[in-house]
Amino acid sequence: MSEALLNAGRQTLMLELQEASRLPERLGDDFVRAANIILHCEGKVVVSGIGKSGHIGKKIAATLASTGTPAFFVHPAEALHGDLGMIESRDVMLFISYSGGAKELDLIIPRLEDKSIALLAMTGKPTSPLGLAAKAVLDISVEREACPMHLAPTSSTVNTLMMGDALAMAVMAGSIT
């Protein structure tokens, strides 16, 4: 029994590491564009996402804030019920959605466009509605989740967290050079 548990844990870690090892090669023009948009932002970075993406988004907003970039998290449902009023034209929105097709996006994107708010996307589907609407797309796609039943986002949440850290560290480096 304990050997089976160890094997399951090791297999999870190996799959997540394998997926994460593909991230560095995805950094390119869009990553630089996203970092520059944040560096030149005169307002705040507003991070948003639903479900596990939202949980990771809260951490990304906290990392940005703790490294000198004004940032906060807003839940998409709350945004649609008045909290979009907190977002100004000088802000940037980083929306996280693995599928890039969250239904809330259909309502949020036009409002962001009306306010001329720059939209950045972190998604596993760069050609999704979110990816197509964004000024820069950070690709967090995975070939395989570590969950044996393919239900729980595992590898994809690791990739999201790592991409958020990479972005925050790049922005921090850009602000001190």
Where are these regions (language model features)?
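An N-terminal, well-structured beta->alpha segment
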Residues: 2-40
